[in-house]
């Protein structure tokens, strides 16, 4: 299984083209975990950095016409250097423009994985799910949504919710770890996209195990943070979550994982 130890040994450079709201939180989370983040947003700079990158995150949270062009340019450069790309199609079910951008990036460029909540991924495959912007209500068929997207796009899929589902090559696993505090802190989902981008390229041909490890590390760190003093308060949880990402070990993952 792809391990946290391997990530810390390789310390992959992860280029994060992400939304303005979460850049600081994302960078701190990746550093705590053991990756090396770069928040570059200029094509000439990306040309230089992606030569050495282990992953690229495209997060469409703060979407503009200019950012759409940036995503396209970054994806072309990433393909040139064979850098795995994770797409986070934030709120793509909330309106036609976001859906149009997400469809363009999925259908016309090479992606290593797509990570989104149930409402976002369901919108990509035409399944009706109650959603509001970046949030989606509890969904019972999250594994079916993941499989439908995996089959449609032939791309590894991560769907997050009260239970998380990962679908790769027609196989699906569900992750039952996590903290109810995560949705109460802005940026936890966006940071997860960057964590997925950190793990996805560690071992070629092991996408399912890499994604499973990424999700377990992230969710168990959330459980650890919530259990700490005042971890039930959003401000404290945010800080303790970064601390937990720094402290979590492969042994913690092995002991506390709940996978079906």
Curated annotation (Swiss-Prot):
Entry EC no(s): 2.7.1.50
Amino acids binding substrate: 39, 187
Entry keyword set: ATP-binding, Kinase, Magnesium, Metal-binding, Nucleotide-binding, Thiamine biosynthesis, Transferase
Pathway linked to the protein: Cofactor biosynthesis; thiamine diphosphate biosynthesis; 4-methyl-5-(2-phosphoethyl)-thiazole from 5-(2-hydroxyethyl)-4-methylthiazole: step 1/1
Sample GO molecular function, one term: magnesium ion binding
Residues given in the record as ATP binding sites: 115, 160
Protein name: Hydroxyethylthiazole kinase 1
Keyword Kinase: yes
Cofactor dependency: Mg(2+)
UniProt-listed InterPro entries: Hyethyz_kinase, Ribokinase-like
CDD domains the UniProt entry points to: THZ_kinase
Gene: thiM1
Gene3D superfamilies in UniProt: 3.40.1190.20
Domain of life: Bacteria
Family to which this protein belongs: Belongs to the Thz kinase family.
Catalytic activity entry: 5-(2-hydroxyethyl)-4-methylthiazole + ATP = 4-methyl-5-(2-phosphooxyethyl)-thiazole + ADP + H(+)
GO biological process, one term: thiamine diphosphate biosynthetic process
Task performed by this protein: Catalyzes the phosphorylation of the hydroxyl group of 4-methyl-5-beta-hydroxyethylthiazole (THZ).
Presence of the UniProt keyword Manganese in the record: no
């Amino acid at each position: 299984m792809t391990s946290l130890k391997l990530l810390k040994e390789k310390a992959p450079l992860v280029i994060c083209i992400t939304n303005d709201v979460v850049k600081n939180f994302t960078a701190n989370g990746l550093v705590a975990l053991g990756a090396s983040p770069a928040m570059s947003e200029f094509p000439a700079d990306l040309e230089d950095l992606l030569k050495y990158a282990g992953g690229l995150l495209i997060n469409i949270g703060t979407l503009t016409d200019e950012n759409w062009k940036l995503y396209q340019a970054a994806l072309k450069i990433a393909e040139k250097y064979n850098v795995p790309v994770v797409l986070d199609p934030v709120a793509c079910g909330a309106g036609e423009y976001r859906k149009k951008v997400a469809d363009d990036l999925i259908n016309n460029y090479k992606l290593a994985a797509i990570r989104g909540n149930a409402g976002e991924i369901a919108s990509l495959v035409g399944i009706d799910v109650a959603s509001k912007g970046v949030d989606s209500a509890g969904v019972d068929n999250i594994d079916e949504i993941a499989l439908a997207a995996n089959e449609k796009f032939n791309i590894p899929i991560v769907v997050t919710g009260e239970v998380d589902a990962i679908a790769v090559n027609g196989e699906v696993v569900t992750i039952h770890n996590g903290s109810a505090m995560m949705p109460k802190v802005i940026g936890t989902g966006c940071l997860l996209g960057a964590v997925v981008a950190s793990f996805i390229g560690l071992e070629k041909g092991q996408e399912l195990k890499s994604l499973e490890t990424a999700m377990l590390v992230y969710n168990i760190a959330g459980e650890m943070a919530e259990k700490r003093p005042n971890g039930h308060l959003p401000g404290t949880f945010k800080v303790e979550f970064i601390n937990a990402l720094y402290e979590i070990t492969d042994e913690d993952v092995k002991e506390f994982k709940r996978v079906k």
